[in-house]
Amino acid sequence: MSNADELLRIEGIRKTFPGVVALDGVDFDLRRGEVHVLLGENGAGKSTLIKMLSGAYRPDGGRVLVEGEEVRIHGAQDSEALGIATIYQEFNLVPDLTVAENIFLGRQPRRLGLIDRKKMEADAAELLARVGVQVSPRARVRELGIARLQMVEIAKALSLNARVLIMDEPTAVLTSEEVEKLFAIVRQLREDGVGIVFITHHLEEIAALGDRVTVIRDGKSVGQVPASTSEDELVRLMVGRSIEQQYPRERPDSGAALLSVEGLTRDGVFHDVSFEVRAGEVVGVAGLVGAGRTEVVRAVFGADPYDRGSVQVAGARVPRHDVSAAMSAGIGLVPEDRKGQGLVLDASVEENLGLVTMRAATRGGLVDLKGQRDAAARVAGQLGVRMAGLGQHVRTLSGGNQQKVVIGKWLLADTKVLILDEPTRGIDVGAKVEIYQLINELTAAGAAVLMISSDLPEVLGMSDRVLVMAQGRIAGELGADEATQDSVMALAVSTNQYKPDKSDKPDASAGKTDQKEAPRGH
């Protein structure tokens, strides 16, 4: 490929912040009509690199060249003028403006000194058609779902005549169907000659969409490889070591039942749900979207009501719809939406770790601040939370470190039963393995873990037993030695209702089926 095809080149880029080297000699290049994947763990330096290309940061050293010419990017206007557009995970759109107004914000076409709305909406409609989204240019942005918001962002980038499009984790919150639509648009943009920098944590997306991959580790570019490179090799480049087993489940002998759920029913949502989780055991809960998994565990935790049934911890009944009672009984919940429900983003690491134990640390109306601080430091160290200090706001932590803080607050509370709802969603492969090791430590210490995950390989790799839900009921149970993607999905699409065996040890063969259906574990 000739130099004429090179859109962007970065040579030896360096960026430091007080006490931190964020980028240390990063090299990267992008060609016309290619998808170049940028891969690395959270904290590796990807975001810093993106912010320099978009004008938010200035490099301390190195060079940036656009179509062979060295350039200086001092702000967003410089970046746009060079044909570089960035789509962040958190969209840069104004909710109360229309789609057309957002696409041309600050660049509205004018006629006789007034905004030419007819032309603006016609141009917006043309751009929206190009990205294949059926939405009115007059629609308010606040009325749109995530997938359509993303298409509006892409249309906005095209309105800038962007030659370089940077996409930061664009599939993180999309369904499988929406991902396929996005991929079709990205492939069309590639055909049109746009160079795309694609950042993702989903390794399976690399071979499906990418041409080349640059791996960043600890602020350095450590390799550039074809997108056909094996996942094992990509993981090795990312984390600097070979991961022999991505799901390092250690299975201690299970003890007595810690969590017992019997006949749990919420009319119209879930019906007659019964199961047990024993000390030292990880029970995975699989199922399709809408199967009722999250609704059941929220009811177990007391966050949502239920109409009939019972929840017991270590043989003692837990009052329904009472979070305080559930916590006192030793139940903890790490919610699916860790930012919205599991953390106070503008509070410190120390404050977040102490959320659950604050009441217990209060004597005579006074909080034992030193005790709380010492305990927070101990747990943060135990979990390996990467932070500047306990006073750092959790908003500024990577996704993996935020999740460690959410789990850490339950460790401080000596939780007996920990419910994990999508525990590794949106975090990189290295941080996932750290979460899995933490699950091993919890069960080795005698805790019971109930884990919901839409990542089927994760469920299969980390569970001692798998419960499969369908249409608000438990359709079956599979032991670790027989659970496969086919057997899980056959139950997930069935209309069976499974009743657990009440013997001391669960019958691993219950719920078996000969039906076959291979899923995509997204």
UniProtKB/Swiss-Prot annotation:
Record has Phosphoprotein as a keyword: no
Gene Ontology cellular component list: plasma membrane
GO molecular function: ABC-type D-ribose transporter activity; ATP binding; ATP hydrolysis activity
Membrane topology: Peripheral membrane protein
Domain of life according to the entry: Bacteria
Residues involved in ATP binding: G40, E41, N42, G43, A44, G45, K46, S47
Subcellular location: Cell membrane
Chain positions covered by the region annotation Disordered: 492-522
PANTHER family registered for this protein in UniProt: CARBOHYDRATE TRANSPORT ATP-BINDING PROTEIN MG119-RELATED, GALACTOFURANOSE TRANSPORTER ATP-BINDING PROTEIN YTFR
The protein's role, per its UniProt record: Part of the ABC transporter complex RbsABC involved in ribose import. Responsible for energy coupling to the transport system.
Recorded family membership: Belongs to the ABC transporter superfamily. Ribose importer (TC 3.A.1.2.1) family.
Protein's name in the database: Ribose import ATP-binding protein RbsA 1
Organism: Streptomyces avermitilis (strain ATCC 31267 / DSM 46492 / JCM 5070 / NBRC 14893 / NCIMB 12804 / NRRL 8165 / MA-4680)
